[in-house]
Amino acid sequence: MAIVLIIAIVFWLFSIMGNPVSQQQRQPVPTDLPPAAAQSPPLIDVHGPGRTSDLLAEWAAPIAEATGIDPQAVRAYGNAELIAREAWPTCNLHWNTLAGVGWVETRHGPYTGRMFDPARLNESGVAAPAIIGPALDGSEGFARIDDTDDGHYDNDTQFDRAVGPMQFIPES
């Protein structure tokens, strides 16, 4: 019993004393250096015919390789930045912010919440199988959002569900 008490006291002493060596090795966080800006996509006609994100393939390829993000997703993020820039010039939403949301929500598309059934972005940039979140029915941990799309996007006519790689709810 005495040994257990001695060990407990030693651990307690170390916990309140901290580790002075690690305190001395800490470097201050620079406050004068902003993070490097992401490479903006080249200007394209986002109102042009066809799938305009395909025009960003050359821009997206090295970014996809460097980041490990699916090229389809990089092109979609870049296209969304250009659309937002045109629609709301003062918005300043950049593709890498969208990529951050995409990573958190679905790891840029493959995470579906099902361990053995990951999604893939097809040639059209659509996740297959579809990524559909849990019903927003007000149960513990979830907001209650009654259906807004008649089940068109989320196959649920009673409640909304977050859909797609970015996990937007249908009303957004």
Over which residues does each language-model region extend?
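N-terminal export signals and maturation junctions of secreted/periplasmic proteins
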Residues: L13-R85
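Catalytic glycan-binding domains that act on GlcNAc-containing polysaccharides
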Residues: S53-A60, A64-S172
